Design a protein with these regions (language model features):
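Short, small-residue-rich loop/turn micro-motifs
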Residues: 24, 154-156, 190
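A generic structural signal for well-ordered coil/turn residues at beta-strand boundaries
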Residues: 146-148, 171, 180-183
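Conserved hydrophobic/aromatic pocket- or pore-lining residues that grip, position, or stack substrates
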Residues: 20, 152, 186
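Short boundary motifs at domain starts and secondary-structure transition points
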Residues: 9-10, 175-179
């Protein structure tokens, strides 16, 4: 979340078209500093994830580059809006999917375990999961360069800084081999790498 916050502050300093949207979670998603520094480009729509996504679609149609920051478990509330309002039209909306995966102390309602399943079937949507903080930064740079929607899912807690010697350019549809062996294959996504 801190890495995302820093990426947003740096990006918004460089690009006036980038706006941030929260659904009553600016502190939890790392957008409170964005709200303070860029109050005219930060929107908190309240507990209304569906509205957050439709609002982002409208802003994208108007020329903005919206970033919708939501907890994974609450993003599923906006399934129809993601599909119909953003993905079918291939609008340039970035979804910052916070608390993806198991989140322990947040309780059973906050486990972000369905986002890969429902986001991966969306047309025109690129879904990514960084293995470390450098890759998270690179994925947001990649997302802002795209003409269509991108979802970046990341776990709660401190960002992992290991495996930085494996830094490569972000390419869609590519996996990364960390170690090669002959007996078994271990497949991991995001912070589990």
């Amino acid at each position: 979340t801190n890495v995302f916050q820093n990426v947003m502050l740096e990006t918004m300093a460089d690009r006036e078209d980038v706006v941030a949207i929260s659904a009553a979670m600016p502190t939890g998603t790392g957008l409170s500093a964005v709200a303070e520094q860029y109050p005219d480009r930060f929107f908190d729509v309240g507990i209304a994830e569906e509205h957050a996504v439709t609002f982002a679609a409208g802003l994208a149609l108007g020329g903005s580059r919206p970033v919708v920051a939501l907890y994974s478990t609450f993003l599923q509330r906006a399934y129809d809006q993601i599909l119909h309002d953003v993905c079918i039209g291939s609008l340039p909306v970035v979804f910052a999917v916070d608390r993806a995966g198991l989140v322990g102390s947040d309780g059973e309602t906050h486990q972000g375990i369905f986002d890969i399943a429902f986001l991966s079937q969306m047309p025109n949507l690129t879904v990514m999961a960084p293995k470390n903080s450098q890759e998270l930064e690179d994925m947001f740079s990649f997302a802002f360069a795209q003409e269509g929607p991108v979802a970046i899912r990341y776990s709660r807690g401190a960002a992992y800084d290991g495996l930085s010697d494996h830094r490569e350019a972000i390419r869609v549809g590519r996996s990364e081999w960390i170690h090669t062996g002959r007996d078994i294959a271990v497949i991991a996504v995001g912070s589990m790498v």
